[in-house]
């Protein structure tokens, strides 16, 4: 619903702003003189690291397993609508961010939720909801799903069965990077994100090429079962609900997590990064998730395998050559590491808002996160999915409420920005964003 409202309120900015989004990411409107710590591409890479995670592989497989192939179409629709929602929350995050005395930046829903509720005379409720959001964000930062699914795929191809050791290795690596601060995080993510996405896309294309004769029938099946009354898990409603649930987890639109990464961008024009953020749901849900679903359906493993999650995607990869799931294992580990890094940063920002920005407070969170990551692989998949959904829902409630309350302000800002920047003919670099 939030995506529909934002798409209509911003006059389909997810379509008309697509070209401008690419120009912002390219750096056409960036300047080192502006406040912030990261370039538009680096901020986007950190956010993409959090969104294009194993939800795009294992989460899609769960959706296809429980909602049928038809859930794919609803995931894509949710991704399209989520582009407008992501645009709104990222713009607000940059607009209401805080620049500390040392030049570092923090932002997110915990800053604009109190602002929104304060506008309607409910400052105390705003403060409470911001705290509620932060508690849920800290819970979500453990990213149990990522570690669990990465271990599942590594175990699938290597028979490595030490769950605690795997979690401990992830925790140690994440701890080393997190202790380096946001600059070390973006240094890793702006390299990992493009590489891991490209590797996965190429691997999926190989699977599709081997099964090329089944691509058109698979697309027809996805469309047909999205509306078929006999579809899995309650027909149309089951496919729709599962598609939207997994899409929300995959692209995080409306949850309020990615805006924390975007808040670090170097800009004095908040809306420019809102346009850059349009690309996240497009890349994650419309491209990556569609490829995952197609790989599963064209290979037929959704009908022949009893596996769920990433194990089902692995079965699809195995239809090419027996060793091909090893490629998926590499991708799974990269996706998991990048997502855990991004969410570790989100959790730390929420922790500092709740408690303190002191170094002691930061160290306490990092130790908490690493200790939880070390046992993350031991959780069963059904419990993991429920935990993820619960944290996402609790984060989305105050975030979307704030977006609704600040909608008139966003509409006015968009109209002004569109006239000043988007419609202004300037082939050379501009310093307005």
Task: List PLM regions with ranges.
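Extracellular loop-to-transmembrane helix junctions
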Residues: 1-20, 65-104, 284-289, 324, ...
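Alpha-helical membrane segments and immediately flanking helix-loop junctions
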Residues: 33-66, 92-95, 101-116, 132-135, ...
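Transmembrane-helix boundary/entry motifs in multi-pass membrane transporters
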Residues: 24-44, 79, 90, 94-140, ...
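Membrane-interface loop-to-helix entry segments
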Residues: 1-22, 137, 149-154, 161-211, ...
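Transmembrane alpha-helical segments of multi-pass small-molecule transport proteins
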Residues: 1, 75-76, 126-134, 156-180, ...
